[in-house]
Each structure stands twice: as C-alpha cells, then as structure tokens.
C-alpha cells in the first residue's frame, strides 16, 4: 500500500467556474447519486477541505468568543457526561448529601449553556454550513474524464488519500470504486 497523500488543489475553473458542469441529480436513482457524491468527494477533497477551513475561520473571525465558548461548552458537557457515567454512584451520593449544591451546579451549567446558545449556534453553523455546501456541490457537479481516471487509480489502491481512508472506514470503498 502506498503512502497517504492529499491530492492537489483543483483549479477554480474546474471546481466551480468555466468548465464545471452542474446538473441536478436524479432523485429516482439514489445509487447513482451516491456514486456521484462519493467520487466528487474523492476528486475535490482538497478544495472541500479548504472551503471547510475558510468557513470555520470566518465564523471564528466574526464571533471568536462565541465560537470558542461553544467549543468549550461542548467539551465540558461531554466531559461531565463521561465523568457522570463513570462515577454514577458518587454522583448519586452527592445528590443525596448536598442537594442544594447539586441544584446550584445544575442551574449554573444551564445558565452558562443558555448564555452561550448564540455561540453554540455559531459553532454549529460554522461546521454545518460548509458541510452542507460541500454536499450540495458534490451532488450537483458532473464528473469529467480526469475525475473518473483519478477515482479509478484511488479504487485500485495505487494512490491513497485521506478522503479515501475515511470512506473506507465508513464502508463506502466499494461505492467509491464504481
């Protein structure tokens, strides 16, 4: 197996301008639509990664505090979930011994989450927005000959890319090769 490499950035003309051919997928043939999306994800992965990074950076630039705080709240909430799951008996004892302190802690966390909701929305949109645009582009973009050749090289294992590995992990390697 060869080493994993990020493919080159595709020209803007190939990606969205001039020679880019766009067409709505046929909703009656979901398998073909899936093949188109997977093959475009493989071929334009560097362009998509750049678009995702720009979207995340833009959201971080526009509302940096909310983006950072929402990431912190998500991390803390997950940490609390893991902690409570591992130490359920201790949480139960604490709740019985100090009900007022537990109630105050729950209210404080709730208040923090409510205060950060704007940031959480910013964080979600900074991820969901670029991902949605990527999937729309991958659905609408028709494949060209160069795209098909690159995807065949990837499918027979001569060239490994991060998106190819991700698709394999998701069980889509047979889809990508067709």
Swiss-Prot record:
Residues 63-64, 120-122 are extracellular. Its main location: membrane. GO terms for cellular component: endosome membrane. It comes from the Eukaryota. The keyword NADP does not apply. Residues 1-41, 86-96, 141-178 are cytoplasmic. The chain crosses the membrane at residues 42-62, 65-85, 97-119, 123-140. It is found in: Endosome membrane. GO terms for biological process: protein transport. The keyword Transmembrane applies. Signal peptide: none annotated. Keywords: Endosome, Membrane, Protein transport, Transmembrane, Transmembrane helix, Transport. Interacts with CCR5 and GDE1. May be involved in ER/Golgi transport and vesicular traffic. Plays a proapoptotic role in cerulenin-induced neuroblastoma apoptosis. This is PRA1 family protein 2. It comes from Macaca fascicularis (Crab-eating macaque). The gene is PRAF2.
């Amino acid at each position: 197996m060869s080493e994993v490499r990020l493919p080159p950035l595709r020209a803007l003309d190939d990606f969205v301008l001039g020679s880019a051919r766009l067409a709505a997928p046929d909703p009656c043939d979901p398998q073909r639509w899936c093949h188109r999306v997977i093959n475009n994800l493989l071929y334009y992965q560097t362009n998509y990664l750049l678009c995702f990074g720009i979207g995340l950076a833009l959201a971080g630039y526009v509302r940096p505090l909310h983006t950072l705080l929402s990431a912190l709240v998500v991390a803390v909430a997950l940490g609390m979930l893991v902690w409570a799951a591992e130490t359920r008996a201790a949480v139960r004892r604490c709740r019985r011994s100090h009900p007022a302190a537990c109630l105050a802690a729950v209210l404080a966390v709730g208040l923090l989450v409510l205060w950060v909701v704007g940031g959480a929305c910013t964080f979600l949109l900074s991820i969901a927005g670029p991902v949605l645009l990527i999937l729309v582009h991958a659905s609408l973009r028709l494949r060209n000959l160069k795209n098909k050749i690159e995807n065949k090289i990837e499918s027979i294992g001569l060239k490994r890319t991060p998106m190819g590995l991700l698709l394999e992990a998701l069980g889509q390697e047979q889809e990508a090769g067709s």
